Design a protein with these regions (language model features):
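Short, acidic/polar
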Residues: 61-77, 162-172, 233-251, 343-354
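Glycoside hydrolase catalytic-domain groove-lining segments
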Residues: 202-203, 207-210, 214-225, 229-329
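Hydrophobic faces of well-ordered beta-strands that scaffold small-molecule active sites
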Residues: 50-56, 81-85, 118-122, 180-184, ...
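Active-site groove signature of glycoside hydrolases
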Residues: 130, 150-158, 162-198, 365-369
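Aromatic- and acidic-residue-enriched segments that line the glycan-binding/catalytic groove
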Residues: 97-102, 126-151, 198-199, 236-238, ...
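Substrate-binding cleft of secreted/luminal carbohydrate-active enzymes
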Residues: 119, 123, 311-397
Length: 397
């Protein structure tokens, strides 16, 4: 009994050590708050040599009631430098033997006419933008088993089809000078949110990276991963990927450019007018992994940037610039801003990330704002503040 008491005390102290950070990261807020003009005076971090841009999600544009082509044209009119486009496998191959890249061709043509540099996500299994999973049904014998690790040995047919798809895409577009990098998969080895628990193995992703490099040895490969900004998410992410590491860890091993997906505040649950949010992004204990990642890139210096320089380059692949609430399509209420991302947060999140590079002597390879389609939908409903916050960054940075 005496030996049990210290053990119980130690267990209690350990539990408190986890619980205390969690409690400091919880925020109970009104879900929708009155719009203000704070974005007009939010400090804008100089970008230096870091190119700025957006990711374009045609499916999200349509979900918000926008015509995707017109939405892309509206965004391309802004004076940013970089845009990320994506090949959605099930749209490009809607039936066995089909190859229909026409829509992606049009997007790339429009970006080139606007003088933008392009990061092309070739997927193929996962790509950015909900639902993030785009394998044609005819390429699978059945649904991927929940909880499974998708390996080359257990899924040779899927891997062969994936390699064929990425090779065909890279060979089609490698002559386009606007393309600066190929993105392979999206958060490659993480589970697919809360909807699916299967994961791609590192070996599966490595084979795809090798295929892209074989088809175009001269361009870098980008892989992205979610940077946990709260203790509960960090613990869950570690537990679910503990066998091979999460997507950021795998990106550091396989890719030339590591893309960070940064979402400092997101909703957990709502009740009436209130929502409980997680926000631990500025807590000291949440800075350590990001610092290690940037330190590694900064220590590597400005030397060769080929496949032998994994982890040398870092880019903010997704900087939160739209709300992350408890629904898939962010709400848009007249005269209100959702607490997870207000117009001023578009600027504050950007400035926070750019300050990381400055503090660690590193020039980020880019900062891509996430949520551009939402800004357009807000403007159409009479609220241009998100777009104006973005424009202010472009003007002042």
């Amino acid at each position: 009994m005496r030996r049990g008491k210290p053990a119980a005390l130690a267990a209690g102290a350990a539990a408190a050590g986890v619980l205390l950070p969690v409690l400091t990261e919880l925020r109970l807020r009104r879900t929708a708050r009155p719009l203000t003009d704070r974005w007009r005076c939010e400090a804008v971090e100089p970008r230096g040599r870091t190119p700025l841009g957006v990711s374009f999600r045609p499916l999200q544009a349509a979900a918000l009631g926008l015509e995707p082509g017109a939405a892309l044209d509206a965004l391309l009119a802004y004076p940013f430098q970089l845009i990320r486009l994506s090949a959605y496998w099930d749209q490009i191959e809607p039936a066995p033997g089909a190859f229909a890249p026409g829509e992606l061709d049009r997007q790339l043509d429009a970006a080139e006419r606007a003088g933008k540099q392009v990061i092309m996500c070739v997927g193929p299994v996962k790509a950015f933008g909900y639902p993030e999973y785009f394998v044609p049904a005819h390429q699978l014998d059945g649904p991927l088993r929940e909880g499974a690790l998708v390996t080359p040995g257990e899924h040779p047919r899927l891997l062969d089809a994936a390699l064929s798809q990425v090779t065909r895409l890279v060979e089609r577009y490698r002559g386009r000078a606007a393309i600066t990098a190929w993105q392979v998969e999206h958060e490659a080895v993480d589970p697919l949110g809360m909807e699916h628990s299967w994961r791609l193995s590192e070996a599966f992703a490595a084979a795809e990276v090798a295929a892209v490099r074989a088809a175009d040895p001269g361009r870098p490969v980008l892989m992205n991963g979610f940077l946990a900004t709260s203790t509960p998410v960090a613990l869950q992410q570690w537990w679910r990927t503990r066998d091979q590491g999460d997507s950021l860890a795998v990106a550091q091993r396989l890719a030339d450019i590591v893309g960070i997906d940064f979402y400092p505040r997101h909703a957990l649950a709502s009740a009436g007018p209130l929502t409980l949010y997680l926000d631990g992004s500025r807590k000291r204990w949440q800075q350590r992994r990001r610092e290690r990642l940037l330190d590694r890139a900064a220590a590597a210096g400005p030397g060769p940037r080929g496949p032998g320089a994994a982890g040398r380059r870092v880019l903010i692949a997704e900087g939160q610039a739209e709300p992350w609430e408890t629904v898939t399509v962010p709400p848009s209420l007249a005269g209100r801003a959702m607490s997870s991302c207000r117009p001023e947060d578009v600027i504050a999140n950007y400035s926070q990330c750019l300050s990381w590079g400055r503090a660690q002597g590193l020039v980020l390879d880019g900062y891509l704002f996430w949520g551009a389609e939402y800004w357009l939908a807000r403007e159409r409903r009479g609220d241009p503040s998100y777009l104006r916050a973005f424009a202010r960054v472009l003007e002042c940075a």
